[in-house]
Amino acid sequence: MCNPEEAALLRLEEVFSATLAHVNSLVLQPLLPAAPDPSDPWGRECLRLLQQLHKSSQQLWEVTEESLHSLQERLRYPDSTGLESLLLLRGADRVLQAHIEYIESYTSCMVVQAFQKAAKRRSEYWRGQRKALRQLLSGVSSEGSVGASLGQALHQPLAHHVQQYVLLLLSLGDTIGEHHPTRELVVNAVTLFGNLQSFMKQELDQAVATQALWHTLRGRLRDVLCTPAHRLLQDSQDVPVTVAPLRAERVLLFDDALVLLQGHNVHTFDLKLVWVDPGQDGCTFHLLTPEEEFSFCAKDSQGQAVWQWKVTWAVHQALHGKKDFPVLGAGLEPSQPPDCRCAEYTFQAEGRLCQATYEGEWCRGRPHGKGTLKWPDGRNHVGNFCQGLEHGFGIRLLPQASEDKFDCYKCHWREGSMCGYGICEYSTDEVYKGYFQEGLRHGFGVLESGPQAPQPFRYTGHWERGQRSGYGIEEDGDRGERYIGMWQAGQRHGPGVMVTQAGVCYQGTFQADKTVGPGILLSEDDSLYEGTFTRDLTLMGKGKVTFPNGFTLEGSFGSGAGRGLHTQGVLDTAALPPDPSSTCKRQLGVGAFPVESRWQGVYSPFRDFVCAGCPRDLQEALLGFDVQSSRELRRSQDYLSCERTHPEDSVGSMEDILEELLQHREPKALQLYLRKALSNSLHPLGKLLRTLMLTFQATYAGVGANKHLQELAQEEVKQHAQELWAAYRGLLRVALERKGQALEEDEDTETRDLQVHGLVLPLMLPSFYSELFTLYLLLHEREDSFYSQGIANLSLFPDTQLLEFLDVQKHLWPLKDLTLTSNQRYSLVRDKCFLSATECLQKIMTTVDPREKLEVLERTYGEIEGTVSRVLGREYKLPMDDLLPLLIYVVSRARIQHLGAEIHLIRDMMDPNHTGGLYDFLLTALESCYEHIQKEDMRLHRLPGHWHSRELW
């Protein structure tokens, strides 16, 4: 059984549908061709608004027809169709939206007086339709303008219809009672359409006020401000207010903008970028905008409250993106708009941001958070901002004169300038990776030319205020030389070492990029020159040459066009040949560059990070970042994203790193932790190690692989091990402090050396081993050559003959290991005696850890003693006279290549605590064997005479 209210709703919808159709044919359809001239911008705008109104009217009619159909179905089949099937109840939101869109389209036309303008174009036609219009309306004065009549015809039926909705739905709610299943739907519909009445009234009031405003403005101001979207919320002529420091004659608050009028000038502020600060005196409040701050002062507290409330809620509404429903300020929380927002703004004031457009996050009138800056000249910056300045990671593009060429800076910024680690790719194809301060290269960094550069170079070292300064390495690919030394103001200045591709080495003093004073020059054939030079290391002035054979030439040297090198001096051929090690193994740079001060630019950022407590926001700025880098310079938009690998992606947050560090303090666990940390390029310790590897390769790989730099390199590796241990201790201190604990007092030298040589050095040495061992190979090439000849000669002898030659006592020979011929003494068997010791010693080449190499040597000694004990059938401790011949035998059968380089590397890198102990003794014994095998009688292919083991000592 249907209610009377449902029948009344049906009749209401029938009448309204017919009215909409009638209005469409009588008013809307004729208005479209009567719109102002489309060739005029205002004419086009009016036509667009009328078309939008026509579209909204059609949508409203369609919804009304659908509602009518649902009512008809309900009345036709009341038993099978429930009350909830009515569109007004189940689809109240949809009906509401159709009404809202219509009223918004209507008021937009009303604000720009589109009806009046259209009526003027067909005034005769509309005068003839007055009677028909009066039939549509109730209470329309015959003296009213045609435009006003058109407006009433388009609005009044809608207002009446909504009013009837509310009345009938209220009555329906009373009829069905509180416990009816659809009671909640009815109450919701009553609320929505009641709110719609309030919304329509507010919209009409604002449109009337806005329309009236245009008549009070001069022509130019009206043209600037008159837009369909504007709705006037407050006018200072109604509630007076003064603005400082800009003395505005009139203040207009629209729903999307705040406008200050000052003479012919119009100052417009987007409400999405207006922040309200309550005042202190009850009559004043403050507004913040991206470029200006204002004080609004009303005559009394009531006026101040009106303005502050309306501005606050207008800002809220603008940020919300749609009009408040049902009225301004309804349903929005909190009472104050958020301080942080997202918006776009183009700066106008003079300064570095003039004409730049910022799009991104804001806070209280300043860019704050993530955003993008674009200048008209093509400059772009995307990244993080703080209080209006670039701060944090950001990418800056600077266009160059060449088309599609940019300088690209992927850096960390502080207070508007580059500060911290960055990667810069220049339009010249040069790339800089390193640190900045106040926008200039400062600290450690690498500058490298492009691969196709006519004069390729790479500088790895320290910078100061944009110039090379301090310790640094420069490789000149064109000249095939590398400079290792000190810099000042972008020039070589101070002690330096130069090495060339040809193997020539120079050490001397530089001043303003030129050699000054005496220096030394070592040639590849080990000739030595001591004197003065030209820039390209040509002998010039007084000097002395010492040749490999001992001859010396002392005098004045020079060169000239067509003359080559010439000299006047004394040639001394009577001098004795020099000690080969005096020149061949002479080391350069030692003492000139204190090892602890060479790479402070690498260590310092890590120390700063630790001293600051390892904050997350400084991790990339101080420790660097991994970034996908390309030399190909692309269009600017391609650069506005940076594929950075954040440290937390692979190793977790800094908190996780420190927590894990605390869980691995026991020796075995610590070793596993450090191995994992050093092998991960995203871990702070791993990053530090990667940078140290880079400096080491820049110095000692390629052209720098020169035997005269071996000591410089090995002391550098040991220093790096100390610094890495100190870095670990720094992280441990921070981890403990975060737990409220303290790190034990500074460790003593012995404890530190034990950890550095026993723990850190073995873990980090593989990263430097290739370049370091190459230097040892070159330094000991001559001895290793003699040693190899001796090994080759000794390998020709069968086991028994070699044992006899080495004067190994026969009762120590492991004869059971041999398959003998009828002549036992001259067995043809080779490589069978002391086989276990030989195979053990060969393992010395399978590790780079000095301690493990010494352990191999100790096990070899044990295998030799074990074999002898087996032969004798009892425990036997070898005296030195018996050990050395047997050790030489094992060394000759192990055939270890470059044994001299191995021995010297082990001695240089082993723990100082082993000095004087068993390892030191065994290494000395191995070194004695190595030196003896180099002797002439060991190298010549002849049956040597007997020798005695005491000759080794």
Curated annotation (Swiss-Prot):
Q: Where in the cell is it found?
A: Cytoplasm
Organism's domain of life?
A: Eukaryota
MORN repeat start and end residues: 358-380, 381-403, 409-431, 432-452, 459-479, 483-505, 506-528, 529-552
Query: Could you tell me the Gene Ontology terms of the biological process aspect for this record?
Result: endosomal transport
Query: A Gene Ontology MF term for this entry?
Result: GTPase activator activity
Query: Which terms are listed as keywords in the entry?
Result: Cytoplasm, GTPase activation, Repeat
Where the record annotates domain VPS9, the positions are: 796-942
Mutating Q280E leads to what result? In a breast cancer sample; somatic mutation
What tissues contain this protein? Expressed in heart and kidney.
| A GO cellular component annotation in the UniProt record | cytoplasm
Q: Outline what the protein does.
A: Acts as a guanine nucleotide exchange factor (GEF) for Rab5 GTPase. Regulates the ALS2-mediated endosome dynamics.
> PANTHER family from the entry?
ALS2 C-TERMINAL-LIKE PROTEIN, ALSIN HOMOLOG
Q: How does it assemble?
A: Homodimer. Forms a heteromeric complex with ALS2. Interacts with ALS2 and RAB5A.
> What name does the UniProt record give this protein?
ALS2 C-terminal-like protein
Origin species, per record, is: Homo sapiens
Gene name of the record: ALS2CL
